[in-house]
Amino acid sequence: PHMWVGRLSFTVPGGTGYCSATAISNNHFVTAAHCVYDTTSNYWYSNWYFTPAYRNGGAPYGSFRATSCTILTAWQNLSGSFSINGWTKYDVAVCGVGTNSAGKTLNQMVGWAGRLWNSSYVKNFFNMGYPWNDTSNYPLPNAGMYLRICTAESRQQTTDTLGMGCNFGGGISGGPWMIGYAPNVTSGWVNSVNSGIYVGQQNLYGIRFTSNN
């Protein structure tokens, strides 16, 4: 399942942004909406490139450019600065991709993770992504270069919002909360993606996937 998860790069005003993402079916990836659309300026980012199994600059399966991204209307209608309570439950995006430089599709190269809806709020999750710092803004070794994994039990934060304790910071956004993951076994279902953190606390927050979103 490690090959399903990768680093997402994209163009933002004045530079490049980074998030995490996961390959899903029909040659799409799932990530956080704030990695796609800025509610502060009502601005779509651009040039999204998903690199599954990214490792220290390496792209073993190639990179895949997004051809389209979809977010919830509720996210696009938000304005102002991000708030975990009231915003996280809309913070998800799905993007379709073209082929890599070898002409291969995303699903041909890495397969895809399953998705799970309407699960209970309390679950044991594996949280994955490419953070460059921890929740205290302390830089991690080889920041953003390697996939990191944390496991913890989730809890209900607000309606359709989950929380769990992991010491990951920026760059983890969009990474999957996975159920049924096991190393070296091709299994796992995405039930949330990383949305926000509280600096100084070992907490991550994410949308709870339901049949309504």
Task: Specify the residue positions occupied by each region the protein language model found.
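Short, solvent-exposed aromatic-acidic interface loops
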Residues: 36, 66-76, 132, 167-170, ...
